[in-house]
Amino acid sequence: MGSSSGQSGYDLSFKILLIGDSGVGKSSLLVSFISSSVEDLAPTIGVDFKIKQLTVGGKRLKLTIWDTAGQERFRTLTSSYYRGAQGIILVYDVTRRETFTNLVDVWGKEIELYSTNQECVRMLVGNKVDRESERGVSREEGIALAKELNCMFLECSARTRQNVEQCFEELALKIMEVPSLLEEGSSAVKRNILKQKPEHQTNTQSGCCS
């Protein structure tokens, strides 16, 4: 399972959003997944995204993962980024109970308002399980809320990388089980190839593309 580069070296392309309160570890989760490193990061200002290519279920995937700011003043900025997302990861901090209750009070409502895809796959992720002694939300509570919201569920630690890859891989597998989302992922690749064709024609008069 490795990253690969190449403009059309993948079979499917999916857009995934990371949402949740500021400080729950969304950026750390993303950095841990992308680069296998763990860093203490400053809060994201606005929206950032990163791309990861990997193979899941025998398919080469390009995941464009959007990391949205959790601060209240940036919330309106994120509304357009829900458009076209095939997967949404709702992140909370298992040591901060308010980040868990906000999944319903704030983020669940935001998804209802802004998500344009009814079949979009959602996953509830409890981060910072490496701080078990400080836990304020039990695993059982997380599972119960995930059932209530019709979400997948996983606990992880961006710091130790426990379950980080599993989080994104399980979400991608679930997305591929939904025919309409699978079609969207395939169409995105075709659009990308068509977009690039004129570039190849002008830049290389006689050559072959890999």
Curated annotation (Swiss-Prot):
Topology relative to the membrane: Lipid-anchor
Task: Recall the GO molecular function terms of this protein's record.
Answer: GTP binding; GTP-dependent protein binding; GTPase activity; myosin XI tail binding
According to its UniProt record, where is this protein mainly located?
Answer: membrane
Matching entries from InterPro entries are given as:
P-loop_NTPase (IPR027417), Rab (IPR050227), Sigma_54_int_dom_ATP-bd_1 (IPR025662), Small_GTP-bd (IPR005225), Small_GTPase (IPR001806)
Its Gene Ontology biological processes?
Answer: protein transport
* Short motif (Effector region): ranges: 41-49
Please provide the record's keywords in A-Z order.
Cell membrane, Cytoplasm, GTP-binding, Lipoprotein, Membrane, Nucleotide-binding, Prenylation, Protein transport, Transport
Gene3D superfamilies reported for this sequence? P-loop containing nucleotide triphosphate hydrolases
Renumbered to this chain, the positions carrying a covalent lipid of the kind S-geranylgeranyl cysteine are C208, C209
Summarize the subunit comment.
Answer: Interacts with XI-2/MYA2.
Name it.
Ras-related protein RABC2a
Organism field: Arabidopsis thaliana
Give the gene that encodes this protein.
Answer: RABC2A
